[in-house]
Curated annotation (Swiss-Prot):
InterPro entries found in the cross-reference section: CapZ_alpha, CapZ_alpha/beta, CapZ_alpha/beta_2, CapZ_alpha_1, F-actin_cap_asu_CS
Keywords tagged on the record: Acetylation, Actin capping, Actin-binding, Cytoplasm, Cytoskeleton, Phosphoprotein
Assembly description: Component of the F-actin capping complex, composed of a heterodimer of an alpha and a beta subunit. Subunit of dynactin, a multiprotein complex part of a tripartite complex with dynein and a adapter, such as BICDL1, BICD2 or HOOK3. The dynactin complex is built around ACTR1A/ACTB filament and consists of an actin-related filament composed of a shoulder domain, a pointed end and a barbed end. Its length is defined by its flexible shoulder domain. The soulder is composed of 2 DCTN1 subunits, 4 DCTN2 and 2 DCTN3.
Gene Ontology biological-process annotations: actin cytoskeleton organization; barbed-end actin filament capping; cell junction assembly
Name of the protein this chain belongs to: F-actin-capping protein subunit alpha-1
The species this protein was found in: Rattus norvegicus
Molecular-function annotations in GO: actin filament binding
């Protein structure tokens, strides 16, 4: 083991550690971090070398965070990344510092938001909040308004999770939706992701994603927001239904095919009569 460690550079160790961290299942960042910490056995190297992995994980997972003094949680995403560990909360028009390891927000400060898109962002945010409240028992959303390559763009992010470590499973739903404000119609692009980890008496992960494209009629802010949400609702309902149906099909066919219904002898063992079997006698004589 010592010879192997001598042959692996610190840079390679950090690269491996970072990969473990960025691929941690939802709700299990701390467990993976602690395991990697033991393997690396160098806290300074881990914190300095893998800091980018902590940030990438939180942005990829749409990690929700509560800011003291504000009611709604905001999502940590690449769209709100202002650099230097500061992120944007467009709903409350503030920026804040985020500790990617502790997952804590601090130092909220007023932040200028693109005034020309305020009414568009607010309309979409209001409609999306109502949708998330109706469809997700533990859901959060953040809506951004940006000018990208000269095009005014709305970006809507949704996150919902259930962490049940006592029952040996954790899961997260993420979806991201975009459209450009270009009358009379605009293309809507979405990506939906589901990740579930079940680890009682085994280790099974469901990782799925779907890309969606549609179009929306761009009129006034309120009406366009309503049409935008209709597209989101239809696509997400269809995706959830398809996942459920595929899972049922796998349970009925694929999973059953992985295990024999009967042993090779085509006879079930009566464990109450095990001593009458040859193997039972052999075990007795052992």
């Amino acid at each position: 083991m010592a010879d192997f460690e001598d042959r692996v550079s610190d840079e390679e160790k950090v690269r491996i550690a970072a990969k473990f961290i960025t691929h941690a299942p939802p709700g299990e960042f701390n467990e993976v971090f602690n395991d990697v910490r033991l393997l690396l056995n160098n806290d300074n190297l881990l914190r300095e070398g893998a800091a980018h992995a902590f940030a990438q994980y939180n942005m990829d997972q749409f990690t929700p965070v509560k800011i003291e003094g504000y009611d709604d949680q905001v999502l940590i995403t690449e769209h709100g990344d202002l650099g230097n560990s500061r992120f944007l909360d467009p709903r409350n028009k503030i920026s804040f510092k985020f500790d990617h390891l502790r997952k804590e927000a601090s130092d909220p400060q007023p932040e200028d938001v693109d005034g020309g898109l305020k009414s568009w962002r607010d309309s979409c945010d209001s409609a999306l909040r109502a949708y998330v409240k109706d469809h997700y028992s533990n859901g959060f959303c953040t809506v951004y308004a940006k000018t990208i390559d000269g095009q005014q763009t709305i970006i809507a992010c949704i996150e919902s999770h259930q962490f049940q470590p006592k029952n040996f499973w954790n899961g997260r739903w993420r979806s991201e939706w975009k459209f450009t404000i270009t009358p009379p119609t605009a293309q809507v692009v979405g990506v939906l992701k589901i990740q579930v980890h079940y680890y009682e008496d085994g280790n099974v992960q469901l990782v799925s994603h779907k890309d969606v494209q549609d179009s929306v009629t761009v009129s006034n802010e309120v009406q366009t927001a309503k049409e935008f949400i209709k597209i989101i609702e239809s696509a997400e309902n269809e995706y959830q239904t398809a996942i459920s149906e595929n899972y049922q099909t796998m349970s009925d066919t694929t999973f059953k095919a992985l295990r024999r219904q009967l042993p090779v002898t085509r006879t079930k063992i009566d464990w109450n009569k095990i001593l009458s079997y040859k193997i039972g006698k052999e075990m007795q004589n052992a």
